């Protein structure tokens, strides 16, 4: 992304070098800074002063748990008044796999030349996937898992983050005594792009002894390569579930309440 901002030139008598603009390139070529990526920075400097600025050097620095500078210095030589000096891929940094989504950070560019020093902020944003469990699709004529059924389920996962996750593997686990996993516990999913849903498929059998309305809890670990790991919790109800309030309370289903008044039947 080009650097856009206001440069306070002050008194431009003598040498005065500014960051004219900068662009970055990401390791996957989409120009979006994402988790686990190596990013290179190309920079263009301009001498807006009235004198030659000699031996111009730039050092980039940042104190951030999610950003690591890999190549932080470069020399831009001498720059005459109103002239520019550019270097492609002059600097590079690594984004941590754990970076939060929509994470803003600032790299400080310290420019030196002719005994002068100028600091400029390079503002950028990094993105990461944000996965959540959105429900279960049951491949059965009545659309539900009943006691004694063997069905294929599709666990629906939403990515509400700003970065895609490529070819993730979903690992299913459950300690529920009424459920038997017939398929592999690992399913390789399609890429999950921002604001998109994808499914992980597994084959399950519910014991004939499973109580109607029993809620099966499970975990889904989603991993991609060595850089992404997310643990999700989900649930699936066995049999048709309804609320007739004959119990005289709200214990049949996990109701949520709001407001200040007491809820009663």
What would you call each of these model-derived segments?
Residues 28-37, 142-149:
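Short, solvent-exposed loop/linker segments at the N-terminal edge
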Residues 68-99, 180-210:
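Intrinsically disordered, low-complexity Pro/Gly/Ser/Thr-rich segments with frequent PxxP/GP/PP motifs
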Residues 1-11, 92-129, 205-239:
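Terminal connector regions
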Residues 244-265:
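Extracellular glycan-recognition surfaces and repeat-rich motifs
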Residues 20-29, 134-142:
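Short, solvent-exposed loop/edge segments of extracellular or virion-exposed proteins
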Residues 46-67, 74, 158-180, 184-185, ...:
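Short acidic, flexible loop segments centered on an aromatic residue
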């Amino acid at each position: 992304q080009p650097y856009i901002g206001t440069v306070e030139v002050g008194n431009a008598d003598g040498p005065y070098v500014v960051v004219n603009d900068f662009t970055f390139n990401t390791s996957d070529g989409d120009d979006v800074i994402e988790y686990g990526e190596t990013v290179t920075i190309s920079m263009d400097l301009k001498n807006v002063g009235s004198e030659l600025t000699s031996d111009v050097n730039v050092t980039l620095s940042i104190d951030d748990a999610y950003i690591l500078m890999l190549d932080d210095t470069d020399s831009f030589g001498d720059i005459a008044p109103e002239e520019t000096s550019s270097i492609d891929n002059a600097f590079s940094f690594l984004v941590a796999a754990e970076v939060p989504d929509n994470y803003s950070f600032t790299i400080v560019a310290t420019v030196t030349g002719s005994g002068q020093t100028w600091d400029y902020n390079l503002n950028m944003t990094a993105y990461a996937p944000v996965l959540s469990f959105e429900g279960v699709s049951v491949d059965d004529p009545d659309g539900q898992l009943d006691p004694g059924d063997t069905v294929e389920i599709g666990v629906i996962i939403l990515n509400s983050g700003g970065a895609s996750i490529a070819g993730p593997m979903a690992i299913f686990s459950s300690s529920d005594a009424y459920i038997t996993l017939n398929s592999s516990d690992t399913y390789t999913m399609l890429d999950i792009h921002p604001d998109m849903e994808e499914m992980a498929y597994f084959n399950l059998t519910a014991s004939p002894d499973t109580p109607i309305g029993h809620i099966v809890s499970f975990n889904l670990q989603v991993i991609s390569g060595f850089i992404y790991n997310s643990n999700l919790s989900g649930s699936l109800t066995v049999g048709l579930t309804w609320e007739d309030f004959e119990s005289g309370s709200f214990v049949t289903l996990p109701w949520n309440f709001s407001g200040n008044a007491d809820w009663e039947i």
